[in-house]
Amino acid sequence: YILNFWATWCAPCVAELPTFVKGEKQYKDAKFRFFFVSLDFKKDYSSKVIPFIKKHLPESSVYLLGDSNYNSWINLVNPEWQGAIPATFIVSADPSKCKFFEGEISEKQLFDTLDTLK
């Protein structure tokens, strides 16, 4: 599983989304599942977030995380995570293959990591 935490107001998040969309298509047969978790504010869902998703992630699995108390759950996701976004977690059945990236991930980093897990 590839979990990407992002928001529409985060420029690096928006910049890396095309890489994930490309990866989602390129690694479809490898049975990777991509999930995009938006940390946008609830007040922006209908005016900004939903239109953005329809335009940029129309075929992707996107979740709107409405809990703005990030400090209450960030450590539960990954103790290494300081809370910055974008943040990407690559989860494998083999814990030794799990990866965490805080900050923008390049196409090479993402694809090289996925290639090692195929």
Segments predicted by a language model, with ranges:
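Short pre-active-site segment immediately N-terminal to redox-active cysteine/selenocysteine motifs
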Residues: 1, 6-9, 41, 84
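Thiol-based oxidoreductase modules, predominantly thioredoxin-like and allied folds used
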Residues: 31-46, 58-68
